[in-house]
């Protein structure tokens, strides 16, 4: 999108938001002034999105309380137990509550499989991870849930892999205490960005990415072109085949309709 069009679109959304905010004050019954949202780790993309929404809702006189968690699976559990009003949930996360309502698909989150370059083994299939020191995410995280799903498809036991969260995985991989780390999130997430730019760390390209989509439709094959991260340093040096899932904003079904409309509008601004 070119800059003039982007500016026009942003200004248009701003005008709509102002008009909506004025009308919002007169809705009967009145929308709530306090709302809770389960996000994720405080260094992750879900929490960053929550912080942005928190500031925008505060401008409308609504207090959004953010609940940091291990990630998507824990978020779903909190939502199912009606302990929060809203949650950010990774596509494919199993939910059991019939009283949940998907509000919006926000953006794609790639599964990044990082490997130390010094590991001489060429990894293009998950079965080639056998015998390596691998982190697949902390229990309760979307990374862990997705990794378990993929490992099960390959008839691999995930009990032998390490349950480290994203920050722990990043630090351990950089320190040489891990060979491979699974991480789900956006490229601008601090930990993921650090690994994408780190010397001695490379991305695994999954040659069978399209086949996973046939097994589970919520998995989307993604192509990361050579140089997409950094053209000057040619990161990555070649095209990488990845898998991605959709980040979704989900609510309990009793959330006020006017609040839903406001959340959808703000989501357009912050994604």
PLM regions and their residue ranges:
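Short amphipathic alpha-helical coupling segments at ligand-binding clamshell hinges
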Residues: 256-266
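Pocket-lining segment of extracytoplasmic ligand-binding domains
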Residues: 158-244, 255
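Aromatic-capped interface at the extracytoplasmic side
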Residues: 20-35
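Hydrophobic membrane-insertion alpha-helices, especially the h-region
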Residues: 8-23
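Conserved small/polar residues in nucleotide/adenosyl-binding loops
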Residues: 269-271
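Acidic, polar ligand-binding/catalytic clefts
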Residues: 70-121, 126, 186-191
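A structural signal for short loop-to-beta-strand junctions that line the ligand-binding cleft
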Residues: 98-106, 134, 232-240
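Bilobed "Venus flytrap"/periplasmic-binding protein-like clamshell domains
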Residues: 32-60, 109-175
